[in-house]
Amino acid sequence: MTTQVPPSSLLPLSPEQLARLQAAVGEFSPTQMAWLSGYFWGMVNQQPGAVVAPAVAAPAAVTITLISASQTGNARRLAEQLRDDLVAAKLNVNLVNAGDYKFKQIAQERLLVIVASTQGEGEPAEEAVALYKFLFSKKAPKLPETAFAVLGLGDTSYEHFCQAGKDFDNKLAELGAQRLLERVDADVEYQESAQQWRQQIVAALQARVPAQSAAAVAVTPSGAVDEITSSPYSKAAPLTAQLSVQQKVTGRNSEKDVRHIEIDLGDSGLRYQPGDALGIWFDNDPALVEELLALLWLKGDEQVSIDGQNISLSQALRSHLELTQNTTLIVDKYAALSRDEKLIALLADKSALQHYAKNTPIVDMVRQAPSDLNADQLVALLRPLTPRLYSIASSQAETENEVHVTVGVVRYDIDGRPRTGGASGYLADRLEVDGDIRIFIEHNDNFRLPANPETPVIMIGPGTGIAPFRAFMQQREADGATGKNWLLFGNPHFTEDFLYQVEWQRYVKDGLLTRIDLAWSRDQADKIYVQDKLREQGAELWNWIQQGAHIYVCGDANRMAKDVEQVLLDVVALHGAMDAEQADEYLSELRLARRYQRDVY
């Protein structure tokens, strides 16, 4: 059958429109033509009041869950940057702090991205412990419908580099989830590798998920990630403040050198909360710089490039490069450069290599294995200088425009030569009162006083771990908090090492500090530590927990914090009539409720 085209005079189309229509419809099948006729009829009849068949709903947009598992803020900042990248790519993203993530919903996740830091001996960040324990428990579900990616942040100066990221990555795969990308393990100088990873993960997610219109993109950050106090000052742009007080607070016969530091914030407007940390930038000891230059037969006036700028080698070593922390990677590189037989042999023994890197400063490694590096080789060998973080020991409710920290000065000898910690030596020996110091606040929403001032508080902090609890008590006093307060503190000797003794005695006298238990490890034949005191008071501890107490632990992550946690588990099991698995779950529930918080390092 031949279709006759009506005379052009009878058509509502111009000859040009008719030609375009005929060219277009030539590509359609009869079925498509029939559908188009109905489509055009619907367009003509879609007038106000007309009944139109409802459009088929578009499939719900897939949401990418982005978990930040941060210890010192780096993972959080990277997660926020990735969130912004995904939003710019018109992808739906839910950014959540690991401590606020409802991990029992993980089986419903389709696209999961984790940015995870590592602390201590390969442990996850404090805010990620509950999620970590759940994934490694019998309750963890299979995840065959989940695709994931992990970025690990760590420090090669530690033996278990990026272990938390590795554990998350391996466990998710073991549970049946599919990798979007291979895991990336980033060192202290993580910016370049993290930037590449961000670009790769955005591309991988774009390939999985169709982009949404700008109006449709959902950004649902949750938890503490986006509640950080805003400030013009940061790690990259620190405040230049002034040192106002530097005072030794241990006795002259003490084995420890602990300094109380007060810094004047002036009218900077810098704000912090009890539980936050102070980041301090420092310069290396000029004497250490000269010693290293002399060992390598370098003058120090050689020009080197640091962050795209040419400066003298001496300036680079003093203000830009890490000299007081050695790593296995540096030992490995230096062994190749120096061709030293002892160092090369050391590389074959992982345990011995770790021990050597931990206990041998860079300058002493160079002394023991002489070499003739040039300036560029030396710069390439070393890592960028990084600031040190100290738990803040004051509340602005009392100190206003000041911030206080408690610093344990690192001092030791290598082959009869005195060595000092980078930042602690700078604060104790080289920075003068009224001198300039570059600082920033590292906010820590995972170490906060309870919102209810009537809630009891248990504070466990031996040594310099007492610092944040000084801030806590200043805040509780200023708030007129009526909740009970219990401090457990320990150090070697009562007469030499009772940090802030007068202040604690006043709090006891005034009734603000309900009870205090002290452990002096060297004042008797048998060593006594805070964990021993805690175990002795197990029944009382359980009573406080039953009354809703919040438990805080600050200090050494490798020994003290682990021992304290074991005591807590034992006390819960004994007095709560639970088995080990139930006690562990109970402690995890306390963590999720923010009733068990740790600031350990």
Swiss-Prot record:
Component of the sulfite reductase complex that catalyzes the 6-electron reduction of sulfite to sulfide. This is one of several activities required for the biosynthesis of L-cysteine from sulfate. The flavoprotein component catalyzes the electron flow from NADPH -> FAD -> FMN to the hemoprotein component. It is an enzyme of class 1 (oxidoreductase). Its cofactor is FAD; FMN. Belongs to the NADPH-dependent sulphite reductase flavoprotein subunit CysJ family. In the N-terminal section; belongs to the flavodoxin family. SUPFAM superfamilies: Ferredoxin reductase-like, C-terminal NADP-linked domain, Flavoproteins, Riboflavin synthase domain-like. This is Sulfite reductase [NADPH] flavoprotein alpha-component. Residues 64-202 form the Flavodoxin-like domain. FMN binds at residues 70-75, 117-120, 153-162. GO terms for biological process: cysteine biosynthetic process; hydrogen sulfide biosynthetic process; sulfate assimilation. Pathway: Sulfur metabolism; hydrogen sulfide biosynthesis; hydrogen sulfide from sulfite (NADPH route): step 1/1. It comes from Yersinia enterocolitica serotype O:8 / biotype 1B (strain NCTC 13174 / 8081). One of its GO terms (molecular function) is sulfite reductase (NADPH) activity. Binds 1 FAD per subunit. Binds 1 FMN per subunit. FAD binds at residues 324, 358, 388-391, 406-408, 412, 421-424, 601. Keywords: Amino-acid biosynthesis, Cysteine biosynthesis, Electron transport, FAD, Flavoprotein, FMN, NADP, Oxidoreductase, Transport.
